[in-house]
Amino acid sequence: MKNFTPSSSNPWDSSKIQLVFRRLGFGCSLSDIDKYSNYTPEQTIEDIIDNAKLTDLTAAPEWADWDNKTFNSSGNNKAYYHTILQKQALSDMINNGFRERLSLFWSNHFVVEYLDVNQPAYLYKYYKLIQENCLGNFQTFVRKMGLAPAMLMYLNGYQNKKNSPNENYARELYELFTLGEGNGYTQQDIVETARALTGFNRTKTYMGEIEFNENTFDKGTKT
């Protein structure tokens, strides 16, 4: 905060306010400049963070729980719904700068690719999960992300079963999402984590909500 400490040679003015908003979001409005001209730099940042925590999540679209069959019978291809979600994300960036700046950061950390997932409802739930947790506890965030339908699809968690384990997500969990490559974990850790995450592969309809399936869960002891 040293660079923002007001002084005669370093006034807290519109250029500084705009700089703060560019670093914490995607810019500010004239009304923001008017408002925060009466705040200290510390008060400005605290208010931006507090407002982000209080901002409502993006409302669920009517297709938030659709399965593959419902999308296919809707009269629009899936790209149409992907575009709706993309436009909503851009609108959120304009209106909720700080939270969406963090959401953008975390979407580049917990990466999924829409062409690989190819289920708009899964991608909406992924987007909502990031909004809900971008200012929260990282451990909680990681736990929920690992069970998100989009992530289960993208890193093959839905294929992870007791008799045919898939280690893809477990490996990325350590290598990319948490500890970093070669940083204090072993192949055995990956194996045991994959076993602990088996069973999330039951759907009542094709590409509907993914549920836990006790029959494909590895109930053996993990170490």
Regions found by a protein language model. Give the residues of each.
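Active-site substrate-binding loop specific to GH73 endo-beta-N-acetylglucosaminidase modules
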Residues: K2, A52, D67-N68, T83-Q86, ...
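Structural motif
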Residues: S7-K16, M93-F98, G184-Q188
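Cell-wall polysaccharide-cleaving catalytic domain and substrate-binding groove, primarily
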Residues: M1-T55, A148-M151, G157-N160, E172-E175, ...
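Phenylalanine-focused residue identity feature
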Residues: F4, F21, F26, Y39, ...
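N-terminal accessory alpha/beta regions
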Residues: K16, R23, C28-Q131
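Generic detection of intrinsically disordered/low-complexity segments and helix-coil linkers/edges
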Residues: P6, V20, L57-A60, E100, ...
